């Protein structure tokens, strides 16, 4: 293919691109078809221009951008409140007649938290609390009451108010799930069958 009348540009690959483009036109036209450009459907498109820049991601929805929100890690207190909320919710959902595995899981969960909790000082204190107050998970009521007691042990050490454990189910009762879909099912499977 001869160079175009206007000459080759500054791109050293320009002659190659033009040759490949001309060759691909010949390949894409059926032998019995007229070589009209409208019928060409290239499998590969080559261009000398730089690729277009991808569009920027859309801004987050307004509810995500709160005026008072801070872009900082959680405080020790925020992590503590969230952890207790999770633990009390788990205890509230704990079965009335747990399997041996569920009782073991409850003990193991507390042990794992005492090892992996993001506040080292808090984790060490929780280990001491667990040593003095081993996990009691024979039923939902027992586990919830034990957790409330342990939470109060921690609260006392921090000079915080004590929660009345007789109200634990009123505060962190069973989740409102249709057809008891929140109930724990005894299973040794890591990923339950669906």
UniProtKB/Swiss-Prot annotation:
GO MF, any single term: flavin adenine dinucleotide binding
Named cofactor requirement(s): FAD
Positions bound to FAD: 76, 81, 84, 121, 125, 148, 151-152, 155, 160, 171
Domain of life: Eukaryota
EC number: 1.8.3.2
Subunit (UniProt): Homodimer.
UniProt-recorded name of the protein: FAD-linked sulfhydryl oxidase ERV1
Species this protein is from: Oryza sativa subsp. japonica (Rice)
């Amino acid at each position: 293919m001869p160079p175009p009348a206007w000459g080759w540009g500054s791109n050293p690959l320009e002659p190659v691109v033009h040759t490949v483009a001309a060759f691909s036109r010949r390949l894409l036209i059926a032998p019995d078809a007229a070589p009209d450009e409208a019928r060409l459907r290239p499998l590969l498109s080559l261009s000398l221009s730089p690729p277009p820049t991808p569009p920027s991601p859309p801004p987050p929805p307004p509810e995500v951008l709160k005026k008072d929100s801070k872009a900082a890690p959680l405080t020790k207190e925020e992590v503590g409140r969230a952890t207790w909320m999770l633990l009390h919710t788990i205890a509230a959902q704990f079965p009335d007649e747990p399997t041996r595995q569920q009782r073991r899981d409850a003990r193991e969960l507390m042990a794992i938290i005492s090892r992996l909790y993001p506040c080292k000082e808090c984790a060490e204190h929780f280990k001491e609390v667990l040593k003095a107050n081993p996990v009691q998970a024979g039923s939902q009521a027992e586990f919830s009451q034990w957790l409330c007691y342990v939470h109060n042990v921690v609260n006392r050490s921090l000079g915080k108010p004590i929660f009345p454990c007789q109200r634990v189910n009123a505060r962190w009762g069973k989740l409102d799930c249709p057809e008891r879909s929140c109930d724990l099912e005894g299973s040794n499977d890591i990923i339950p069958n669906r």
